[in-house]
Amino acid sequence: YWKWTMNRRELLDKHPDWYAVNRKGESCHDKPAYVDYYRFLCPNHQGVAEYLAEDYVKEAHKPYVDGVHLDYVRMPDVILPVSLWKNYGIEQKEELPEYDYCYCDVCRELFKAKTGQDPLELKYPMENQSWINFRLDAITRVVDAITKAVKADHKAISAAVFPGPSMARHMVRQDWGEWTLDAYYPMIYNKFYYEGPEWIGRSVKESVETVNGRAKIYAGLMFGDIKDNFEEALDEAYNNGASGVSS
């Protein structure tokens, strides 16, 4: 059963305070980044992890469902794939405040209690490793809560993730190498990054080495990106340890 995780519209009216806030103070509730459907929840708000875990278990518990598949299990893109910059008339050579999440009151207070620093007062937030890790860990805790609940129901769990996972940490605050899922589907859309098919192999290799046998890696390939060198792309994925490919 496939369902978006952090990107949820159904709570706009009931829990407007649950939505992530960027460094400019704008909430995904009423001013989402990039596109109207980017309505991301803050992973640190009390009740968010519990709500999501219960929502997935409700589906996993159905007898005809073998497992759940997470998607949008991350923050909004602080850095978009480079080929998409032109679509929005932007150049993300640095982390721009309107795409940098989350700076809501809950996140600020939790980080300040932990480090003594207000993230809004950091001179270089993109270089502050404590602040980076704080947000990586917040998403991981949500995933852990969902995973624990789903596995208690003896169902499988997988996720669509950004490639890397080094790129995932940098681009969307997604540290999926620390998760404990059964399978990962990194979205290795090579032309999004102006890369050739050999990049697919490098990305798969990093992913396989990261999970180190704990989970399967299925390379998510964009057919339009590989149609002219389809066999080479598949060889790159399989020769570097992918258990399969998806498109």
Regions inferred by a protein language model and the residue ranges of each:
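Active-site beta-loop-alpha junctions enriched in small/polar residues
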Residues: 3-7, 70-75, 162-164, 189-191, ...
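Aromatic- and acidic-residue-enriched segments that line the glycan-binding/catalytic groove
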Residues: 6-34, 72-121
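Hydrophobic faces of well-ordered beta-strands that scaffold small-molecule active sites
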Residues: 1-2, 66-71, 157-159, 184-186, ...
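Glycoside hydrolase catalytic-domain groove-lining segments
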Residues: 97-233
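Structural motif
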Residues: 62-63, 179, 240
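Active-site-adjacent "subsite" loops/lids of carbohydrate-active enzymes
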Residues: 1-63
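Aromatic-rich peripheral "rim/lid" segments of glycoside hydrolase catalytic domains that contact
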Residues: 228-247
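Conserved, mostly hydrophobic/aromatic
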Residues: 52, 59, 68-71, 150, ...
